[in-house]
Regions:
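Conserved alpha-helix/loop element of class I SAM-dependent methyltransferases that forms part
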Residues: 53-75
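Class I SAM-dependent methyltransferase SAM/SAH-binding core
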Residues: 78-82, 86-136
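A short acidic, Gly/Pro-enriched loop at the edge of an enzyme's catalytic core
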Residues: 135-147
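A short SAM/SAH-binding and catalytic strip from SAM-dependent methyltransferases
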Residues: 146-158
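Short, glycine-/aromatic-enriched active-site segment of Class I SAM-dependent methyltransferases
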Residues: 178-198
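Conserved Class I S-adenosyl-L-methionine
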Residues: 221-303, 307
Length: 307
């Protein structure tokens, strides 16, 4: 089963509605006393200005701690951020670990914003972004030491193709790091499913998909309580304020934003709503000599061509 043009259009419309513009981000920074032309990456992601993952920047810290238990990326590592959005998670990774990050997203306006924000924060040399489909990536096999995918898989119908591509671009022994919601999705998700495509396998189904693609499951850490607490806090602020604020969700019109938040709160508070961190390792099919990691580049490109 493949993702349809209708799925893509619905997703684009959804994220266009909740994504802040560069001007809106600059205004929020100035209101906080930060010069948007000379800002640090953390001054963006700590205010949730460039993150769309569930739980925002607090969840990024949790993810980094879990990865630190296994194999934290280092300065020589290249990490792929699937569904990078505005690039906040990637800049967080550069800030935290000193690695390099390549981000892909199917929505051009988000890639443009990600590039602009990396330029503003001086991270243009450690981050790069391109428009690409997660199920049809143009990177060589084994190009990345880690693939991060935060609350993105739930929007992709073609799960088998998705995880096959992730396994293909991971080097042997490389890590898949993902955060997502598992199914079956309860009726409380109906308002969200009207807005955007949602396809959530159960946790056993998700593990089978990951392992069937050639990866070995390492751990699953439930995060439902953390995410629910975050959304409850945002809902309170949305009620008390006018609806405008620093996070992407609060840029939605007040009524629409409240309805979407309520759907998530009801879902995560039910027996059917679960979110969690999954780590898996690419099965080592053969040994790889030290220092032989490939730089990510388009298939067919020669070394030294760049990109």
């Amino acid at each position: 089963m493949t993702d349809s043009a209708a799925d893509t259009q619905r997703l684009a419309s959804f994220y266009e509605a909740i994504s802040p513009s560069l001007d809106a981000i600059a205004t929020a920074l100035r209101a906080a006393g930060v010069d948007p032309d000379h800002c640090l990456a953390r001054e963006l992601y700590q205010r949730d200005l460039d993150c769309h993952n569930l739980g925002m920047h607090e969840m990024l810290g949790v993810l980094a701690d879990v990865v630190g238990e296994y194999a934290p990326p280092g300065p020589d590592d290249e990490v792929l951020d699937v569904g990078c959005g505005l690039g906040g998670p990637g800049r967080f990774l550069v800030d935290r670990f000193g690695c390099s990050v390549v981000g892909i997203d199917l929505l051009p306006f988000r890639i443009e914003l990600a590039q602009a924000l990396s330029g503003l924060t001086g991270m243009g040399d450690r981050t790069s972004y391109r428009v690409a489909y997660a199920t049809q990536m143009d990177f060589e096999g084994g190009a990345f030491s880690q693939v991060w995918m935060l609350d993105v898989g739930i929007h992709i119908r073609a799960k088998q193709a998705l995880f096959a591509e992730i396994a293909r671009v991971l080097e042997p022994g490389g890590l898949l790091v993902m955060h997502d919601q598992t199914g079956p999705l309860p009726e409380t998700m109906r308002p969200l499913r009207r807005e955007a495509p949602y396809f959530a396998p159960s946790l056993p189904q998700l593990i089978r998909l990951v392992e069937g693609a050639g990866m070995r499951m390492l751990t699953w850490r439930e995060t439902t309580g953390r995410v629910l607490t975050y959304f409850l806090g945002v809902r309170t602020m949305l009620t008390e304020a006018s609806g405008a604020g620093s996070t992407a969700l609060r840029t939605v019109q007040r009524e629409r934003g409240a309805a979407l938040l309520d759907a998530y709160i009801d879902t995560l508070g039910s027996s059917g709503g679960r979110t969690g961190i999954l780590l898996a390792e690419r099965v080592r099919v053969h040994s790889v000599p030290a220092g032989s990691r490939r730089r990510p580049r388009a298939a067919g490109a020669k070394r030294g061509d760049g990109g």
